[in-house]
C-alpha cells in the first residue's frame, strides 16, 4: 500500500505551502500565495495549495496517511527556550513567555492546521499529524532532496524557526544527525533582515535587493564587525543594534523595526526611495561581506572535517538564497558539490517535513531534479480563459511556437511566457517567466518600463542551454535552479550584456531539455538566430505581486501592464496594433 504524505507549512505566519509525496515521489508542491494572489500569503493556511496537491494526485483526503508539519514543540529541558529568555532579558514579558508558555505558537498553529484539514474534507478523528522541528525540515529539504549518497554536511540558516536560527549537521544513510544549533536572537538571517529594513526594504522581500546593491558599494568603507561575531564556536549578534524586540526597537510612523535607534545614531537615517546611492551602497556591501565572512567561518568550524572527507554540502533556509555566499562556498577547495534546496525559504519546509517523515517510515525520497510541480493548463483552458476575460483578448493558436517566440524576442521584444507546470519556489525557471533576448540592446530597460518598474541596479538573470554553460560560465557545477552566481567569461560579457551584473557575474539557470523541452527549444532557436543559446529570464508578475499561476492571472497581468506579447502554451495573445509575426506561419 502506497505511503502518502502531505506536507503543510505556514507556522511562521508567512509563505504557507503544500507538498505531496507518494511512495517517495514528489507529486506536487505549491505556495498558497499563487492561488490567493497575495504575496507571501501572510496569516493564511495552505488550503488552496493542499487542495491542488490532492487534485493533482487524484486522491481523496482519506488516502493521506500522514500530514507532516514543519513546526514542533520544544522542550523546556533543552537549551533553546532558556537561551531566548536570557538574551531577551530586557523584554521580561517575552522572556517569561518563552519559559512558561514556550510552545503556545505550536499549539495555535496545530489547531489552525486541523481546521484547514477539516475544510479540505479530512476526518478530524482520523488525521495523523506529525510535527517536525523547523530546522530539521529545512535540513531534510536539502539533504533528502539532494540525491547525495555519501556522508553529507548539512547547513541551515534563516531568520528563525521555533527558536533555532542556524543548523549544522550531517546526513548519512538517510538519517540526519544534528551537530549544533544557534538560537534567537543570535541569527545571521535576522541580522541581514534588520539591515534590509534599515536600507529601506521589506524583510522577506528585500534581502535579495541588498545583495544586488552590494556590488555597487565598497565594503572597506564601513566596518560592520561590531554587529556580530563568531568566536569559540558561538555566533553572537550585538542586540544593542539589531535583532531587537519590544521597547528596544526603532519606531517610525507607528511601525517598529528589527533594529534599534542606536543603529540610526551610528549610520544615520534609514534609506528611502529606489536610488542606489551613498553611503547606503557601502552599507549593503559591508553587510554582505560580514554575512559571507561569518557563514564561511561557521562552515569551517562545524562542517570542515566532513567536507574534507566527502566534499558534499546540502544547504537550506532563507539565507541559502544568497547566491553570492553560495558562489563563495563552491569556490572552496573542500566542496565538490553544493545542493541548495530551490525553495529554501519557509515554503520549502512543506517538502522537508514530508520528506523527513517519509524517510523515518522507511521510504526514501527521490532526488529533486526540477521544480515544475504546480498546476498546468491546456490550450483549451487558455482559450476558455480568453473567452471569459473582460479585456476580450485577441488570440491565435500558432505552429512551431518556440521558433516564432524566438524571432519576436530577437527583435527586442519582451515576452510573457506561460508554459507547463508552475514552478515551486521563488525563482521563475521557464514555467512562468518574462523572457527577452539578452543580446538585444535595452531589453532589460524595456522589461522595466513595460512591467517590472524595479530598481535598475538589480540584475536580470540568464537561463541557458546546458551546451552553452561550459563556454559562458567559468565553473563546472550543476546549476538547474538559479541558486548560484558565476563569473561570466569575457567574451560572453559582450555577447549577452543584458544578463551580466555589475561585478561580472550572472545568477544562472543551466537547463537540460528533459525537464522543460519547450523552453529549451526556444533557446535553441535563439541560438540559431543570434549564436547565443541564452534567454533573459525574470518572474512573470508585476512588482509586489505573487508569481502568476493561471491563464486568468496571466491575462490580468498582461492587460495591467505595457507588455505586448503573451504566449500561453500555443496561444499567442498580442495587444491591439502589435505585429503578431503571422508571416512566420
Each PLM stretch: what is its role?
Residues 5-77:
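N-terminal cofactor/phosphate-binding cores enriched in small/glycine residues
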Residues 7-32, 36-39, 83, 90-94, ...:
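Flexible beta->alpha loop and helix N-cap segments adjacent to enzyme active/binding sites
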Residues 56, 60-114, 140-141:
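Short beta-strand-loop/turn "lid" adjacent to the catalytic site in phosphate-handling enzymes
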Amino acid at each position: 500500500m502506497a505511503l502518502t504524505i502531505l506536507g503543510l507549512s505556514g507556522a511562521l505566519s508567512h509563505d504557507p505551502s503544500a507538498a505531496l509525496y507518494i511512495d517517495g515521489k514528489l507529486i506536487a508542491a505549491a505556495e498558497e500565495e499563487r492561488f490567493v494572489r497575495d504575496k507571501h500569503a501572510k496569516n493564511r493556511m495552505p488550503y488552496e495549495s493542499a487542495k491542488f496537491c490532492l487534485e493533482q494526485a487524484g486522491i481523496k483526503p482519506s488516502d493521506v496517511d500522514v500530514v507532516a508539519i514543519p513546526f514542533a514543540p520544544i522542550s523546556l529541558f533543552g537549551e533553546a527556550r532558556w537561551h531566548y529568555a536570557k538574551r531577551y532579558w530586557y523584554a521580561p514579558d517575552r522572556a517569561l513567555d518563552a519559559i512558561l508558555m514556550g510552545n503556545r505558537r505550536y499549539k495555535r498553529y496545530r489547531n489552525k492546521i486541523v481546521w484547514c484539514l477539516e475544510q479540505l474534507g479530512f476526518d478530524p478523528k482520523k488525521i495523523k499529524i506529525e510535527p517536525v522541528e523547523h530546522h530539521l525540515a529545512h535540513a531534510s529539504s536539502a539533504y533528502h532532496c539532494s540525491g547525495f549518497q555519501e556522508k553529507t554536511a548539512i547547513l541551515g540558516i534563516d531568520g528563525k524557526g521555533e527558536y533555532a536560527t542556524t543548523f549544522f549537521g550531517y546526513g548519512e544513510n538517510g538519517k540526519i544527525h544534528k551537530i549544533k544549533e544557534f538560537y534567537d536572537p543570535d541569527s545571521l538571517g535576522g541580522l541581514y533582515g534588520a539591515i534590509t529594513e534599515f536600507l529601506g526594504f521589506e524583510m522577506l522581500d528585500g534581502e535579495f535587493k541588498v545583495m544586488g546593491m552590494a556590488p555597487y558599494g565598497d565594503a572597506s568603507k564601513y566596518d560592520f564587525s561590531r554587529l556580530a561575531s563568531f568566536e569559540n564556536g558561538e555566533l553572537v549578534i550585538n542586540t544593542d543594534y539589531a535583532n531587537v524586540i519590544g521597547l528596544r526597537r526603532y519606531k517610525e510612523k507607528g511601525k517598529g523595526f528589527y533594529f534599534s535607534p542606536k543603529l540610526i545614531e551610528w549610520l544615520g537615517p534609514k534609506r528611502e526611495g529606489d536610488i542606489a546611492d551613498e553611503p547606503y551602497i557601502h552599507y549593503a556591501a559591508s553587510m554582505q561581506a560580514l554575512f559571507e565572512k561569518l557563514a564561511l567561518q561557521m562552515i569551517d568550524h562545524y562542517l570542515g572535517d566532513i567536507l574534507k572527507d566527502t566534499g558534499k554540502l546540502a544547504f537550506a533556509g532563507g539565507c541559502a538564497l544568497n547566491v553570492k555566499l553560495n558562489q563563495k562556498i563552491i569556490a572552496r577547495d573542500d566542496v565538490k558539490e553544493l545542493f541548495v534546496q530551490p525553495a529554501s525559504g519557509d515554503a520549502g519546509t512543506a517538502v522537508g517535513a514530508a520528506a523527513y517523515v517519509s524517510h523515518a517510515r522507511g521510504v526514501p525520497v527521490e532526488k529533486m531534479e526540477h521544480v515544475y510541480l504546480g498546476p498546468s493548463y491546456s490550450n483549451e483552458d487558455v482559450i476558455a480563459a480568453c473567452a471569459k476575460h473582460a479585456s476580450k483578448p485577441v488570440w491565435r493558436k500558432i505552429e512551431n511556437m518556440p521558433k516564432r517566440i524566438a524571432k519576436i524576442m530577437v527583435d527586442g521584444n519582451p515576452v510573457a511566457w506561460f508554459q507547463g507546470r508552475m514552478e515551486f519556489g521563488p525563482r521563475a525557471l521557464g514555467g512562468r517567466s518574462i523572457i527577452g533576448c539578452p543580446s538585444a540592446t535595452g531589453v532589460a530597460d524595456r522589461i522595466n518600463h513595460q512591467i517590472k518598474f524595479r530598481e535598475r541596479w538589480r540584475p536580470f538573470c540568464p537561463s541557458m542551454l546546458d551546451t552553452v554553460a561550459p563556454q559562458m560560465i567559468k565553473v563546472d557545477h550543476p546549476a538547474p535552479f538559479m541558486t548560484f552566481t558565476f563569473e561570466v567569461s569575457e567574451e560572453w560579457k559582450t555577447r549577452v550584456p543584458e544578463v551580466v551584473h555589475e561585478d561580472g557575474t550572472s545568477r544562472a539557470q543551466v537547463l537540460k531539455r528533459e525537464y522543460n523541452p519547450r523552453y529549451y527549444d526556444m533557446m535553441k532557436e535563439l541560438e540559431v538566430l543570434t549564436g547565443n543559446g541564452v534567454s533573459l529570464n525574470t518572474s512573470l508578475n508585476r512588482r509586489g505581486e505573487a508569481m502568476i499561476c493561471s491563464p486568468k492571472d496571466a491575462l490580468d497581468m498582461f492587460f495591467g501592464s505595457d507588455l505586448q506579447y503573451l504566449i500561453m502554451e500555443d496561444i499567442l495573445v498580442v495587444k491591439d496594433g502589435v505585429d503578431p509575426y503571422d508571416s512566420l506561419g
